[in-house]
Curated annotation (Swiss-Prot):
Name of the coding gene: manA
Name of the protein in its database record: Probable mannan endo-1,4-beta-mannosidase A
Residues annotated for substrate binding in this entry: W78, N155, N191, Y267, W330
Disulfide bonds: none
Species of the source: Neosartorya fischeri (strain ATCC 1020 / DSM 3700 / CBS 544.65 / FGSC A1164 / JCM 1740 / NRRL 181 / WB 181) (Aspergillus fischerianus)
Main location per the UniProt record: secreted
GO biological process: mannan catabolic process
Catalytic activity of the protein: Random hydrolysis of (1->4)-beta-D-mannosidic linkages in mannans, galactomannans and glucomannans
Family: Belongs to the glycosyl hydrolase 5 (cellulase A) family.
An MF annotation (GO) of this entry: mannan endo-1,4-beta-mannosidase activity
Chain positions carrying an annotated carbohydrate: N249, N320
EC class name: hydrolase
One GO cellular component term noted in the UniProt record for this chain: extracellular region
Length: 373
């Protein structure tokens, strides 16, 4: 078949335009800001560890409908649910570890529940941060691997080759399900990875090799660590969170080329600091991200009471700090078919006065600052 020059040129132009349109679907980081659906700037969101464990699709849809209505753009979810023994019928789990073997549950009470979360989010334009393992024992965590593979020390998770092979098999299984989904904001290595008492080289090498592995599987989506932001010299006051006690070096880890943006959390009540201290914590991480040329995401923050008075100053500081391009409060709450979603004291329920100050007023401030009103 013969093609004229104009026909070929038109085809090539069309392909370039299609590629550009496709690229717009996927969230990205550029300099110190995030871009979502063609908009570059600062974005608000929340956390919901439980949404992937719901068994009623209508409940999942309800959450994303309310998020969209409220202007929340990013939801961080647990992409893991590890067990050492198979639970009773009707209980969702994603992977079972026992006797040196890990088996991924791709059934209706397994990753198909996460499938629906991704599907529902995609329909409503909500972006997801999907996490692969927990530092803590909630929903199995690293210790579920450690126990099944004959280790006793939590930190063996990072060094035991059999554990890391199992972890990577799981990462590949999840990533391969959603490689083409624009609903994925980023893949996240772990929730709050720590290696207490370790040389920072241990976490650094694990983060580097794991993020490189994920990028080989999926070049379209961003990758982040999910750390708390520990181990930072810049603007340090010498308090516990700035130290390297937990084996993390924020600045060095952020510089890894296959890490697209920085993450940091804030829990003054757990860390032995004041609530006011949190403003400096956000500013120091913004400065570190600015120096690295990558955006920071204020990924978790919360208190168990007096939410509006204590958390809104952190939101204002974050919004006005160069280098920080979004924040996700911990955690989202809603009224589901079975009643209220889990409440750990930090939960902000949709439709309440607290939701207005933490979410609606904050989203309005973001839009006003960026001219998105």
């Amino acid at each position: 078949m013969k093609f004229s020059f104009l026909t070929v040129a038109s085809f090539l132009i069309g392909q370039v335009a299609l590629a550009a349109l496709s690229a717009k679907k996927f969230a990205s980081a550029s300099d110190l800001q995030f871009t979502i659906d063609g908009k570059t700037g600062y974005f608000a969101g929340s956390n919901s560890y439980w949404i992937g464990f719901l068994t009623n699709n209508a409940d999942v849809d309800l959450v994303f409908d309310h998020m969209k209505e409220s202007g929340l753009k990013i939801l961080r979810v647990w992409g893991f649910n590890d067990v050492n023994t198979v639970p009773g019928q009707g209980t969702v789990y994603y992977q079972v570890h026992a006797n040196g073997k890990s088996t991924i549950n791709t059934g209706a009470d397994g990753l198909q529940r996460l499938d629906y979360v991704v599907h529902s989010a995609e329909k409503r334009g909500i972006k997801l941060i999907i996490n692969f393992v927990n530092n803590w024992d909630d929903y199995g965590g690293m210790n579920a691997y450690v126990k099944a593979y004959g280790e006793t020390d939590h930190n063996a998770f990072y060094s035991n080759k059999n554990i890391q092979n199992a972890y990577r098999r799981y990462v590949k299984a999840v990533v391969s399900r959603y490689t083409n989904s624009p609903a994925v904001f980023a893949w996240e290595l772990a929730n709050e990875p720590r290696c207490k008492g370790c040389d920072t080289e241990v976490l650094y090498e694990w983060i580097k090799s794991t993020s490189e592995y994920i990028k080989k599987l999926d070049k379209r989506h961003m990758v982040c660590i999910g750390d708390e932001g520990f181990g930072l010299d810049l603007l340090s006051d010498g308090s516990y969170p700035y130290t390297y006690v937990e084996g993390s070096n924020f600045t060095r880890n952020l510089a890894i080329p296959t890490i697209d943006f920085g993450t940091f959390h804030l829990y003054p009540d757990s860390w032995g600091t004041t609530h006011e201290w949190g403003n400096g914590w956000a500013q120091s991480h913004g400065a570190a991200c600015k120096a690295a040329g990558k955006p920071c995401l204020f990924e978790e923050y919360g208190v168990t009471s007096n939410h509006c008075a204590l958390e809104t100053p952190w939101q204002k500081t974050s919004l006005n700090t160069t280098g920080v391009s979004g924040d996700l409060y911990w955690q989202y709450g809603d009224t589901l078919s079975t009643g209220q979603s889990p409440n750990d004291g930090n939960t902000i329920y949709y439709g309440t006065d607290e939701f207005k100050c933490i979410v609606k007023d904050h989203v309005a401030a973001i839009k006003a600052k960026q001219g998105w009103v």
